[in-house]
């Protein structure tokens, strides 16, 4: 079985083609600037990169180019389109309806469309991508894998906001959580790595990238997560503010004479560590400002980022009445030993101690960085959302036979 994984953005498509027999990535790539001048597809096979600049007026043309790349005489990996067993689509928002991945049919498409108001930037391109794939591969089964699905096990007292209940009834305002596919993959991989059943563990998974979230995983299920109604909630991120007093929103609107859309843009795209530092949304630049340049604002942004994560680790340990495993993943979580060191500092009371030498030597593979005598296992687990999507797709399509 060979599955194509598609992640459609408003002007881009990320893709991977995976042989599920041994979970080998046969090809992967990125289509950029769809509908914009200078559109390009970058296709990678066996470590070689093939870049093609060509006009792409829409997502259908872009997906046709992806299929052409997979079938290419020089660097293709299949001879016939029928070798694509199924397509797994990453969908950001599935609302309350889906706690698992599902085979896409008319009802599922309607549900994804119904969630457009909850994810106006993400769900519309997903819908366009699915429709394009259906046109080009009408006989290939399609599966929707939702970022929100893993968090549907969160109890109501953790996902409800203390505003009039009628707004939940009318508008479904509640915590949804995101990065669910990553948290699901990483929690299961971490349990397997330490030889335990995920159902027997209390874990905190820290997905730390430009977008960042933390999830409490108890007995294999999400019981709380830091992101909320939108991905703006929770931690201080690259350009997102994270949690703060809601009154700040109306205060800024009044003081700056801006509307709801403008304040939303400010909090999503001009805040976070970039807003605090005035330097960058990239943690590498912030670390340089902190350790090398001794820039006060960079030092502040770095400290705020780490502090918020430490806060959530403590909170979720309390929620689960204990902690067996702390896991770091995502671009920063996997690659920044400095951030991991700062976050785990002075966490002895929770039984968290890391070995500095092991922490400094992480290298893109699952690693245990716990110090000897640490009651909590501290792990670095590279995430692989595409593989999780491909696995879910395999499971669902396999049941059709």
Curated annotation (Swiss-Prot):
Pfam families: Acetate_kinase. Its EC number is 2.7.2.1. It is an enzyme of class 2 (transferase). The record marks 179, 240 as: Transition state stabilizer. The keyword Magnesium applies. It catalyses: acetate + ATP = acetyl phosphate + ADP. Homodimer. This is Acetate kinase. The lineage of its organism: Bacteria, Bacillati, Bacillota, Clostridia, Eubacteriales. The gene is ackA.
């Amino acid at each position: 079985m060979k599955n194509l994984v598609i992640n459609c953005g408003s002007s881009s498509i990320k893709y991977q083609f995976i042989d599920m027999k041994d979970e080998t990535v046969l090809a992967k790539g990125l289509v950029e600037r769809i509908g914009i001048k200078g559109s390009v597809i970058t296709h990678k096979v066996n470590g070689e990169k093939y870049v093609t600049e060509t006009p792409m007026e829409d997502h259908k043309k872009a997906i046709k180019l992806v299929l052409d790349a997979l079938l290419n005489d020089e660097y293709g990996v299949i001879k016939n389109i029928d070798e694509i067993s199924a397509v797994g689509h990453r969908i950001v928002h599935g609302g309350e309806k889906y706690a698992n991945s599902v085979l896409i049919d008319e009802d599922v498409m309607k549900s994804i469309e119904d969630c457009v108001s909850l994810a106006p930037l993400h769900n519309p391109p997903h819908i366009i991508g699915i429709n394009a794939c259906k046109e080009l591969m009408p006989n290939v089964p399609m599966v929707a894998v939702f970022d929100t699905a893993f968090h549907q096990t969160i109890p109501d007292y953790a996902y409800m906001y203390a505003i009039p209940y009628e707004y939940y009834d009318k508008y479904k305002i509640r915590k949804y959580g995101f990065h669910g596919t990553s948290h699901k993959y990483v929690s299961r991989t971490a349990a397997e790595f330490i030889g335990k059943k995920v159902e027997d563990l209390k874990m905190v998974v820290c997905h730390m990238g430009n977008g960042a979230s933390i999830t409490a995983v108890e007995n294999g299920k999400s019981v709380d997560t830091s992101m909320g109604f939108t991905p703006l909630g929770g931690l201080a991120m690259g350009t997102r503010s994270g949690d703060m007093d809601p009154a700040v929103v109306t205060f800024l609107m009044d003081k700056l004479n801006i509307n709801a859309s403008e304040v939303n843009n400010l909090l999503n795209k001009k805040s976070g560590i970039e807003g605090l530092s005035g330097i960058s949304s990239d943690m590498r630049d912030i670390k340089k400002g902190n350790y090398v340049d001794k820039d006060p604002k960079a030092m502040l942004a770095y400290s705020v980022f780490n502090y918020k994560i430490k806060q959530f680790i403590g909170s979720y340990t309390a929620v689960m009445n204990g902690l067996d495993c702390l896991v770091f993943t995502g671009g920063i979580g996997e690659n920044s030993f400095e951030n991991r060191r700062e976050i785990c500092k002075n966490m002895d009371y929770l039984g968290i101690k890391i070995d500095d030498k092991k922490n400094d030597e992480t290298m893109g593979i699952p690693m245990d960085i716990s110090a000897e005598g640490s009651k909590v296992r501290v792990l670095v687990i590279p995430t692989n959302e595409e593989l999780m999507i491909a696995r879910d797709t395999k499971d669902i399509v396999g049941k059709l036979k």
